[in-house]
Amino acid sequence: MAKEPTEAAHPQPEQTKTNHKAHRPVGGYVLAKDPIEINQGRPRTTLTVRNTGDRPIQIGSHFHFFEVNRYLEFDRSKAFGLRLDIPANTAVRFEPGDEKEVTLVPFAGKRFIFGFNNLVDGWSGDGPTPDYQPNREIAAERAEKLGFKSCKSGGKDAK
């Protein structure tokens, strides 16, 4: 008859103690003890947006909000040069018929915007527009001509 294995015959490895305060996910960085506020000090604009289409629409964090799906109805002129005030790699989803408020912040850097729906393809900053760059009015006319919905209500500047 075989003998039962004993603890002495099969020693267990010593348990390692984990310092949970220093723990971080693989590849992650701990930048500060306190939460980090995104877009700190940037002006914010709040708009009411309604999905008039029959399909869900999802908008990513760094999409030029002026150029989002043509079936989203909001004051597009107030969204010129702005993006969602949400963490990178996240999105806001609008189901058909949904109406919700979104908060927008200006793009940083030189504020040149290209691609998306090709409504701007140039500088999106405030102030005088260089002659060779499209301006807010031209982009708004282009959006209207291409059937992008807009309304003049539902926007406010947040402090």
Curated annotation (Swiss-Prot):
GO terms for biological process: urea catabolic process. Pathway: Nitrogen metabolism; urea degradation; CO(2) and NH(3) from urea (urease route): step 1/1. GO terms for cellular component: urease complex. It is found in: Cytoplasm. It is an enzyme of class 3 (hydrolase). InterPro entries: Urease_beta-like (IPR002019), Urease_betasu_sf (IPR036461), Urease_subunit (IPR050069). Keywords: Cytoplasm, Hydrolase. Its EC number is 3.5.1.5. Disrupting the ure2 operon has no effect on urease activity or pathogen survival in BALB/c mice when administered orally. This is Urease subunit beta 2. The gene is ureB2.
